[in-house]
Curated annotation (Swiss-Prot):
Its cofactor is [4Fe-4S] cluster. Keywords: 4Fe-4S, Iron, Iron-sulfur, Isoprene biosynthesis, Metal-binding, Oxidoreductase. It comes from the Bacteria. Converts 2C-methyl-D-erythritol 2,4-cyclodiphosphate (ME-2,4cPP) into 1-hydroxy-2-methyl-2-(E)-butenyl 4-diphosphate. This is 4-hydroxy-3-methylbut-2-en-1-yl diphosphate synthase (flavodoxin). The lineage of its organism: Bacteria, Pseudomonadati, Pseudomonadota, Gammaproteobacteria, Cellvibrionales. It holds the Pfam family GcpE. It comes from Saccharophagus degradans (strain 2-40 / ATCC 43961 / DSM 17024). Pathway: Isoprenoid biosynthesis; isopentenyl diphosphate biosynthesis via DXP pathway; isopentenyl diphosphate from 1-deoxy-D-xylulose 5-phosphate: step 5/6. Binds 1 [4Fe-4S] cluster. It catalyses: (2E)-4-hydroxy-3-methylbut-2-enyl diphosphate + oxidized [flavodoxin] + H2O + 2 H(+) = 2-C-methyl-D-erythritol 2,4-cyclic diphosphate + reduced [flavodoxin]. Its EC number is 1.17.7.3.
Length: 370
């Protein structure tokens, strides 16, 4: 029997980033960020489309100059996914992309400048109903906070965030979310936990500059997992020095592992040993690659022998338990058929696609009857 998620999410206000709800009772959204030159419109559009295909809900784009702002306007016209403009130093860039159709403005309290500049951004955002993200980062805290604390700390991150929350409150602007990111897992977790008790706005989670594909995945999974288990977090971004598509995949895997969202196939597979009756690792790699396009939630077990195979296979939609001379396949917990070693992956792929299509059709039929 599969356990239900025990997580009770923190109550937060809901904002809209384009047509995507963030906070409140909305699903936790997944973001990524382009790493192309924004002025290269073709490359940036192509990457955004790949990120969207991978399952992202929102994409952030760095806008470091006015030339990039104009390019952002061209990009905005060519993609359908909500776009966040990442703004540093020059508040005038925020004003320009607001006019060009941005769905959310990320500003950094550590470098956006005086309150007068923030007010200009707030006024523009209010006029056009654009949400703002107050994006605090341990690597770019305000100079006075660096002096006060000596080094980045959870308290410093939270103080920076609250300072700018107070500014937005003063001007009666509530259409915003907040992040307090650090590359240190414990610092980020402590900061988010403290901030979560002091504001009601949505929280954007991330472990900043987490590292490469393997190390960054581990750090992000540990840090974000701790917070999400606490019920903290309304949108997440996994920061990896890797293809942004990988960020989306990891983000989905984190949410799926905590049963906070479902999409595509949840594979359960043994690490393989000398008892395996087929090549588990090769089979898994093939199936993951071939079935990436399936979005219907489905649990699939691939177990190499009869020790744990039947037990795992009974708990999933499609289960494979290795055997000799044939491998036993379960469908919806019931033994269904046996597959030869030859063409094992082809046979499994065909069966999984059939089950996914049937499940999708049933869900559509239920919705149609409601």
């Amino acid at each position: 029997m599969q356990f239900e998620s025990p997580i009770k999410r923190r109550k937060s206000r809901q904002i809209m980033v384009g047509d995507v709800a963030v906070g409140g009772d909305a699903p936790i959204t997944i973001q990524s960020m382009t790493n192309t030159e924004t002025t290269d419109v073709e490359a940036t559009v192509a990457q955004i489309e790949r990120i969207q295909m991978a399952g992202a809900d929102i994409v952030r784009v760095s806008v470091p100059s006015m030339d990039a702002a104009e390019a952002f306007g061209a990009i905005r016209k060519r993609v359908s996914i909500p776009l966040v403009a990442d703004i540093h130093f020059d508040y005038r860039i925020a004003l320009r992309v607001a006019d060009l159709g941005v769905d959310c403005l990320r500003i950094n309290p550590g470098n956006i400048g005086r309150e007068k500049r923030i007010l200009a951004v707030v006024d523009k955002a209010r006029d056009l109903n654009i949400p703002i993200r107050i994006g605090v980062n341990a690597g770019s805290l305000e100079k006075d906070l660096q002096t006060k604390y000596g080094e980045p700390t959870p308290d410093a991150l939270v103080e920076s965030a609250l300072r700018h929350v107070e500014i937005l409150d003063k001007y009666d602007f509530q259409n915003f979310k907040v992040s307090v990111k650090a590359s240190d897992v414990f610092m980020a977790v402590a900061a988010y936990r403290k901030l979560a008790t002091q504001i009601e706005q949505p929280l954007h989670l991330g472990i900043t500059e987490a590292g490469g594909l393997r190390g960054g995945t581990v750090k992000s999974s540990v840090g974000l997992g701790m917070l999400l288990m606490d019920g903290i977090g309304d949108t997440i971004r996994v920061s990896l020095a890797a293809d942004p598509v990988e960020e989306v995949k990891v983000g989905w895997d984190i949410l799926k592992s905590l049963k906070l969202r479902s999409k595509g196939i949840n594979f359960i597979a043994c690490p393989s040993c000398s008892r395996q009756n087929f090549d588990v690792i090769k089979t898994m790699n093939e199936l993951e690659m071939r079935l990436e396009d399936i979005t219907t939630p489905l649990d699939v077990a691939v177990i190499g022998c009869v020790v744990n195979g039947p037990g795992e296979a009974k708990e999933v939609d499609v289960g494979l338990a290795g055997g000799t001379p044939k491998n036993l396949v379960y469908v919806n917990g019931v033994p269904s058929q046996k597959f030869e070693q030859e063409n094992l992956v082809d046979s499994l792929e065909q069966l999984i696609r059939k089950q996914a299509a049937e499940k999708e059709a049933k869900e559509k039929d239920i919705i149609a009857k409601v």
